[in-house]
Amino acid sequence: MTYLLALDQGTSSSRSIVFDTQGRIVASAQLELPQIYPRPGWVEHDPREIWRTQLATAREALAKAGLAAADIRALGITNQRETTVVWNRATGQPIHHAIVWQDRRAEPLCAQLREAGHADTIQRKTGLLIDAYFSGTKLRWILDNVNGARAAAERGELAFGTVDSWLIWQLTGGRRHVTDVSNASRTMLFNVHTNQWDDDLLALLEIPRALMPEVLPSAADFGRTAAEVLGGEIAIGGVAGDQQSALFGQACFSAGMAKNTYGTGCFMLMHTGGVFQTSANGLLTTAAAQPTAAPAYALEGSVFVGGAVVQWLRDGLRAIEHSGQVQQLAESVPDSGGVMMVPAFTGLGAPYWKPDARGTITGLTRGTTIAHIARAALESIAFQSAALLLAMSRDAVASGGAPVSELRVDGGACVNNLLMQFQADLLGIPVVRPACVETTALGAAYLAGLSSGVYQSTEELSALWKAERRFVPTLDKHRADELMARWEHAVAQTALAA
């Protein structure tokens, strides 16, 4: 038998999954990753803990599967994107905690860049908006604030990487300093047209080029693990940022195919093929996972509060004792009773980009119960995701394509049947849940399998993808449009609440 190992390094945990060549899970392991909050708005991880937990889960998954390194054809890596690590090349030790994608400390620098008129250039070259979310300004902060960092960087003594680069450095014993195009495209330093680090952007942010890793396609030779790491050498054959990896694991390989990941937030990506498409509707353009040197792009939108609204029902309102109870509570009423909730706890993301918005609950009457509020909270996840998909479809049609005809779903909240049915009703298209919902890790395994010859083509991978359940719309379009209009009215009211 042939097996593939996927390392899935996320924001809250490190996981490793062994897959067979049919994409079935053989064994898995997971460890929580400690979060560090030095100041309000700052979020850090200890890079040594990232490595320790990831290595431990890889070893545990292999042990659970009863496999040795020699049984693994190749290893794939998927990771939290944008999180920034800088380490000493000689010692392999980080010079500062990793600055996590959620961290906002670089916002003053971003404001300066916007005020200086650099937004159009950065979007044209990178597909991104100027935001502290991305790696470039985090890296600049480290160079400016860690004693001796800039001088050491200019001497070529330091290495920068997103989490994938850090893991590969550790896995290979410091022999490879590399990343893939999908991770590079989230730095605000990478030109997605040339697939190169952009000298002008590096100069703008005062970042020495010597810091930067080599950029490879997402299915490539990223090196081999040092024998002592996993008990033998394993080829590292696939790397992709978590959302691009999920798009790949969902077998969304051609223009117009889309997936939505329902986690703490929601992340929706629509493949645009080889076309770099700038959104007119508040979306980002990003590099999709690229198994070859051929360019591939996607439109991306992020919802800040998805499943987190269920955590709020549990911890804030104490309406439920555990998250699994929300569907039963919401189903105890036929609808939300006119209640509309906009969970703008941390502002609103795409396609609205209203950082100052605050959450609202409207439509309350004397007859409103906690069940109506729970249902409105669940429905808010679907409303926000529908706004993203409608924006994507407008962009697709404007560029001569067709609107999205099916949405593939994954992430923890996709197991909620009420939510998935309401999502299909709002969108007027089928919502499809796959047999394997671990699509992020599966995407990394598929990329590793392509580079190592386990799979010959993406067509072969498409044939492996299987649906577990298909949610078909049951609401007429007129009613769905009415509901979306009510949602947009509620969103407009969040500006008044700010």
UniProtKB/Swiss-Prot annotation:
It comes from the Bacteria. Keywords: ATP-binding, Glycerol metabolism, Kinase, Nucleotide-binding, Transferase. ATP binds at T11, S12, S13, T264, G307, Q311, G412. One of its GO terms (biological process) is glycerol metabolic process. Glycerol binds at R81, E82, Y133, D242, Q243. Inhibited by fructose 1,6-bisphosphate (FBP). GO terms for molecular function: ATP binding; glycerol kinase activity. ADP binds at T11, R15, T264, G307, G412, N416. Pfam families: FGGY_C, FGGY_N. Key enzyme in the regulation of glycerol uptake and metabolism. Catalyzes the phosphorylation of glycerol to yield sn-glycerol 3-phosphate. HAMAP family: Glycerol_kin. This is Glycerol kinase. The lineage of its organism: Bacteria, Pseudomonadati, Pseudomonadota, Betaproteobacteria, Burkholderiales. The gene is glpK.
